Regions:
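C-terminal or late-domain output modules
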Residues: 49, 123, 136-141, 160-171
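Terminal "cap-and-tail" regions of soluble proteins that handle hydrophobic small molecules
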Residues: 151-193
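Short beta-strand edge/turn micro-motifs at domain boundaries
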Residues: 109-113, 117-153, 157, 190
Length: 193
């Protein structure tokens, strides 16, 4: 083995991603990454004893994130860099907020406080950190609103993607405005999940 290949092997061995359950922060990050890429199964694997309500909430968030990501993919394929709808940028900001969020650890329990978001509660289960009930972070009204929003988001994303493919939407600005209008948004930076 040459010195270069040995150094490369050492680098690769030491630069592997952290075990998702190794710390509260790495667990919360792995959970959010899974949700944002639309992978409800991987996200649910990081939830402590998921209830039916947890499964619904995680699947809803993952489906919404996936629909919006696919819409942005269609917009960027049609309009190039101008087709950026702010969705990927919002996802990056959400992940970055976890990296800097204050963390409280008390024994086998932890709470991460991301700026501008609800606290993420975690607990250690058999030596691994897991996200506590995502559904409990929502009130009953918020759960009902999530269900409505999911349906609206998926329908709006599919409809707008179809319009972009059919060239009925003429510009990236028109696509962003149509998405904001469909989702009832007036903000300039991205769209919420």
């Amino acid at each position: 083995m040459t010195a270069l290949s040995w150094m490369l092997a050492v680098f690769l061995a030491t630069s592997s991603p952290p075990d998702p359950g190794a710390s509260p922060r790495s667990t919360a990050r792995a959970y959010l990454e899974a949700v944002l890429r639309g992978d409800a199964g991987s996200a649910l694997a990081l939830v402590a004893d998921p209830s039916d309500a947890d499964r619904f909430v995680v699947r809803a968030h993952a489906a919404s994130a996936d629909a919006l990501r696919r819409l942005e993919d269609v917009a960027t394929s049609r309009f190039g860099a101008r087709g950026d709808l702010g969705i990927a940028a919002r996802h990056r900001r959400l992940l970055a907020s976890l990296d800097h969020a204050p963390l409280e650890v008390s024994g086998d329990r932890a709470v991460l406080h991301p700026e501008g978001g609800k606290p993420i509660r975690l607990r250690r289960v058999l030596g691994k950190w897991k996200v506590e009930s995502p559904a409990e972070r929502l009130t009953g009204e918020e759960q009902r609103a999530l269900e409505r929003t999911l349906k609206e988001t998926e329908a709006a994303a599919q409809d707008l993607a179809g319009q972009i493919r059919a060239r009925a939407v003429k510009s990236a600005e028109e696509a962003r405005e149509a998405l904001r209008k469909a989702l009832g948004q007036v903000q300039q930076e991205g769209v919420p999940l």
